[in-house]
Amino acid sequence: MYSYTELRKEHPEFIYRGYEIEESADKVGIVYDFEIPGLASFHPTWEFPKKRGEQRCFKENGTFQKLVFSLGMVELISYWKTACPPVVKVEAGSLTEEQCEWWKDLYFNGLGEFYYTNGIQENQEDFMEIRSLGGDVEGAEQPLSREAEGFLIPVGGGKDSAVTLSLLEGEKEKNCCYIINPRGATLKTVERSGYGEDQLVTVKRTLDKNMLELNRQGYLNGHTPYSAIVAFSSTIAAY
């Protein structure tokens, strides 16, 4: 396994270069562009279904662009952790100083298992510096009205999902279930809770093969704040 300190010296920067939105009649795809110079580039993808009869153009939608940018801010930590560069350059969008500190807080407090597993002693002040180098997103803001009812319930196949579905059973007709990369356990949970296919929103997330290869080679690995991935991606799905 590579040394945390040595990796940070050898790879001082992580760059969030941008993202591309690929749109068709029935779905929206997102391809992110991350890089650790001198080590690897990463292009994870997401695929979201469009609502039936959807007429909006998401490529030109400023609100949607901000949601996509923010999901990229969550996604990047899975790739940053391979070498933990001390500087993160954000070229894909603009962040205020307060927002940079918010993201640092999310990252640091979501990496506890990662630090423990790898025997790393670190503090929130020094583990990362976020530099905002990009401009504001393009496109007019298109916020949604507040008239929508019901809940979008994330389902991971575990006890938390089953308990949530049970607690909200009385409002089942208004609710939908949300699954990232559907599999047997998640689909069974939804089915046994009495939700139909028309109440199921499924999205596809693909990890970049370069990260998986670095993990195989002994670069740093461990848990990242997955609940944040669920939260930010489900916001896009609901939008």
Place the predicted regions along the sequence by residue.
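Short, hydrophobic/aromatic alpha-helical segments in well-folded domains
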Residues: 163-167, 230-233
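An acidic-aromatic substrate-binding cleft motif
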Residues: 151-153, 163
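Hydrophobic/small residue at the entry helix of a nucleotide-binding pocket
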Residues: 160
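Class I SAM-dependent methyltransferase "Motif I" SAM/SAH-binding loop
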Residues: 155-157
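Conserved adenosine/adenylate-binding substructure
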Residues: 213-239
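RNA-binding accessory domains that recognize and position tRNA/RNA substrates
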Residues: 1-150, 167-207, 216-220, 239
